[in-house]
Amino acid sequence: MQLLGNRNGVFPRRLATQDYFIQDPRYLQCYADMFCRFIDLYKAEGLPITKVMYQNEAYSYTPYPGCPWTAEGAQRFNNDYLAPTLRKHHPEVELWFGTINTNRLDYVERTLDNEQLQSNIVGIGTQWECRDNLPQLRKRYPKLRLMMSESECGNGAMDWKAGEHTFFLLSDNLGNGVDEY
């Protein structure tokens, strides 16, 4: 897999053609149940969870261990397992879709155009390359809120230039309709 060089403005270069999360109902329900278990455990420590997203960077096809999902797998898990389980055990917790870290708008739309999914989520969590899609997402899904779910840490310099970049990201995201960070 080529990881360096020109990406032709697209991230990731390749999308997963299969779900890396095992699509057996037992595993899917167990994963949904674990969300509720973590919500319970955090609440017991005085840390209420108000919103969840099913997977960080679910569209990164990486050489290191990750968990890419197909559009169909993401819809299946969120619609058939996570949303109903949250409604039953934690109706106070919002379900957001994300985090979306790809600028492959065609793929994002293929996932989010599912009406059942739209009715199950409150908003869309975006980060990194997905920032390129914010105007289109805002227009296509006006009832869904947008969240900047992660900031770009770059190379970790933590210097003034990195601070300026983070300020730019916040400004750009807010200017494109993001109302959560």
Protein language model regions, located:
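Substrate-binding cleft and catalytic face of glycoside hydrolase catalytic domains
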Residues: 1-109
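Detector for Asparagine
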Residues: 6-8, 56, 78-79, 101-103, ...
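Alpha-helical scaffolding within the catalytic cores
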Residues: 36-38, 79-81, 101-114, 130-136, ...
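Alpha-helical structural signal in soluble globular domains
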Residues: 41, 45, 80-89, 110-120, ...
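Aromatic- and acid-rich polysaccharide-binding/catalytic face
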Residues: 44-56, 93, 98, 109-132, ...
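Short flexible/disordered coil segments
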Residues: 59-76, 106-125, 154-168
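Catalytic-core region of carbohydrate-active enzymes that cleave or remodel glycosidic bonds
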Residues: 123-181
